[in-house]
């Protein structure tokens, strides 16, 4: 069912509450990466260019104490947003009370207001975590500030918080509209089509440290994928399940039986490394050696080897849909990044396929290579995109009205 989208709304003269994802890295008041702010611009611009008043809510980081509040204020984000929009943005250093209500009442059509970090509500009270615990009274209060609600925060779509599900529930309860923003719409389109209606051959590439993080994804995508290519630390649990020697490699001993089950269920769909780049210690300076699918006792696998890269590329060259989540090795160390970077290059060369990247390290690899413009879609949600690939219902999407 198609969701109600921001451009289905008549925003002129209306106060539009927008849950954005401004959870960006900030150190000493300086934003390290503004991609999430940039990703929210189309929705914000639509509202203000059509005469709406945009009231923006977001969390930033994990707020555990008053000491965190200085580092986790959204003030620098509001300043950066003002630069990107090339117009003034009002920052309100609170998200509840008279100061907030006055700022909103003083808005003119086309104005933008950013309220303070929603997670300050997790410590500013005697009621426990009001925001991340989805306190209905907080959701109702925030909903009372606007005429309609737009959820554009895919990064928190797998969570039921007061600032997404709480507001949407209260809005709908009052006969008001709750719609998806353009970013949420894009995520639903690309991830939804890949999971539910992929063009074949459909290749899933999974990496990262733990099998346990990806069990749901593998189970959901075995019947849908033509191939599931596995690299990263999780590959060694699968290799151990096949009876290979894995030396000192990272693996989950308690998941070996599960890996065997997944291998049996998948048949020949799961493709594992046939060689590995190994070292005696987890260090960029350690001497490297290419070994087969058995790793010597004194060594650990830290990247996929050249034969595996060639094998994976050969499978990818015919793909029409590709979803990649997780690095192929210890990507943070340049000497063990080649597998991840080569997979990124292979995806960039697929001109006749839909390519989707999710997860922090895979996304970082795409940026490092400068291939982002050649990728169909880079997901803005780590946990949310994994949950979506598992086939789970995401509360932040479910709370938005259908057309």
From Swiss-Prot:
Pathway: Carbohydrate degradation; glycolysis; pyruvate from D-glyceraldehyde 3-phosphate: step 2/5. Gene3D superfamilies: Phosphoglycerate kinase, N-terminal domain. It holds the Pfam family PGK. It comes from the Bacteria. PROSITE patterns: PGLYCERATE_KINASE (PS00111). GO terms for molecular function: ADP binding; ATP binding; phosphoglycerate kinase activity. It is found in: Cytoplasm. Its EC number is 2.7.2.3. Substrate binds at residues 21-23, 36, 59-62, 119, 159. It catalyses: (2R)-3-phosphoglycerate + ATP = (2R)-3-phospho-glyceroyl phosphate + ADP. Its main location: cytoplasm. Keywords: ATP-binding, Cytoplasm, Glycolysis, Kinase, Nucleotide-binding, Transferase. One of its GO terms (cellular component) is cytosol. ATP binds at residues 214, 301, 332, 359-362. It is an enzyme of class 2 (transferase). One of its GO terms (biological process) is glycolytic process. Monomer. HAMAP family: Phosphoglyc_kinase. Belongs to the phosphoglycerate kinase family. This is Phosphoglycerate kinase. The gene is pgk.
């Amino acid at each position: 069912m198609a969701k109600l989208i921001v451009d289905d709304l008549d925003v002129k003269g209306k106060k539009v509450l927008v849950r954005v994802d401004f959870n960006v890295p900030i150190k000493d008041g300086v934003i390290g990466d503004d991609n999430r702010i940039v990703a929210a611009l189309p929705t914000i611009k639509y509202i203000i260019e059509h005469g709406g008043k945009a009231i923006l809510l977001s969390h930033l980081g994990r707020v555990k104490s008053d000491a965190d509040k200085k580092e986790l204020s959204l003030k620098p984000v509001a300043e950066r947003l003002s630069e990107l929009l090339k117009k003034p943005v009002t920052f309100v250093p609170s998200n509840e009370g008279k100061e907030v209500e006055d700022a909103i009442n003083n808005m003119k059509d086309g104005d933008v207001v950013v309220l303070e970090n929603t997670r300050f509500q997790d410590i500013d009270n005697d009621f426990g975590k009001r925001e991340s615990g989805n306190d209905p009274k907080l959701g109702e209060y925030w909903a009372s500030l606007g005429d309609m609600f737009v959820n554009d925060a895919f990064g928190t779509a797998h969570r039921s918080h007061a600032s997404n599900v709480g507001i949407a529930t209260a809005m709908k309860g009052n006969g008001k509209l709750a719609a998806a923003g353009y970013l949420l719409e894009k995520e639903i389109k690309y991830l939804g089509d890949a999971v539910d209606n992929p063009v074949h051959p459909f290749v899933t590439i999974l990496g990262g440290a733990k099998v346990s993080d990806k069990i749901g994804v593998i189970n959901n995508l075995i019947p849908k994928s033509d191939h599931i290519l596995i690299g990263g630390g999780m590959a060694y649990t699968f290799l151990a399940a096949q009876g290979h020697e894995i030396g000192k490699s990272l693996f989950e001993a308690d998941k070996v039986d599960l890996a065997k089950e997944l291998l049996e269920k998948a048949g020949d769909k799961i493709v594992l490394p046939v060689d590995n780049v190994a070292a005696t210690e987890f260090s960029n300076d350690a001497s490297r050696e290419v070994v087969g699918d058995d790793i010597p006792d004194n060594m650990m696998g830290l990247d996929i080897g050249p034969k595996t890269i060639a094998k994976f590329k050969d499978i990818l060259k015919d793909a029409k849909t590709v979803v990649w989540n997780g690095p192929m090795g210890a990507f943070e160390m340049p000497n063990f990044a080649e597998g991840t970077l080569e997979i990124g290059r292979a995806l960039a060369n697929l001109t006749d396929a839909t390519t989707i990247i999710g997860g922090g390290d895979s996304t970082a690899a795409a940026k490092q290579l400068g291939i982002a413009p050649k990728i169909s879609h880079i997901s803005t949600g780590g946990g949310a995109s994994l949950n979506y690939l598992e086939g789970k219902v995401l509360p932040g999407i479910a709370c938005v009205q259908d057309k």
